[in-house]
């Protein structure tokens, strides 16, 4: 085999190997990327039973606390959705603040949240 053919074969092998590595990295990242849908997008996915994340703002005067759960409305300023959550809310959770909820759609306008994340900007300062 000529030197030129060997170099071409080695270069092709390296190129193939690097493409395989990039493919596997992208496949793994696709499963772990944390994105969220807007409320309007989530309502169109109401038939979906897979866990999703929805991001939006908590509607003012919509938070209803009971012994077993918290119910509130979340909006993207276009549409609103009812969120039901059983658990302890994050300390930064408040009305008219940004939240991301993770869970499943119950019906067209109700979302059963398993986790609630309070969103904050880059100037976050924990409460003392």
Curated annotation (Swiss-Prot):
It is a single-pass type II membrane protein. The chain crosses the membrane at residues 8-28. It is found in: Cell membrane. Residues 1-7 are cytoplasmic. GO terms for cellular component: plasma membrane. Pfam families: CcmE. Heme binds at residues 120, 124. GO terms for molecular function: heme binding; metal ion binding. Its main location: membrane. Residues 29-128 are extracellular. The keyword Acetylation does not apply. One of its GO terms (biological process) is cytochrome complex assembly. It comes from the Bacteria. The keyword Metal-binding applies. Keywords: Cell membrane, Cytochrome c-type biogenesis, Heme, Iron, Membrane, Metal-binding, Signal-anchor, Transmembrane, Transmembrane helix. Belongs to the CcmE/CycJ family. Heme chaperone required for the biogenesis of c-type cytochromes. Transiently binds heme delivered by CcmC and transfers the heme to apo-cytochromes in a process facilitated by CcmF and CcmH. This is Cytochrome c-type biogenesis protein CcmE.
């Amino acid at each position: 085999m000529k030197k030129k053919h060997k170099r071409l074969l080695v270069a092709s092998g390296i190129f193939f190997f690097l493409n395989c590595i990039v493919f596997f990295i992208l496949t793994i990242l696709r499963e772990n990327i944390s994105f969220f849908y807007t409320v309007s997008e989530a309502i169109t996915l109401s038939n979906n039973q897979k866990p999703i994340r929805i991001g939006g703002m908590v509607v003012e005067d919509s938070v209803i606390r009971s012994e077993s759960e918290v119910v509130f409305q979340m909006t993207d300023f276009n549409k609103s959705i009812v969120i039901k959550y059983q658990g302890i809310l994050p300390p930064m959770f408040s009305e008219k603040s940004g939240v991301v909820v993770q869970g499943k759609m119950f019906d067209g306008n109700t979302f059963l949240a398993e986790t609630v994340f309070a969103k904050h900007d880059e100037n976050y300062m924990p409460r003392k």
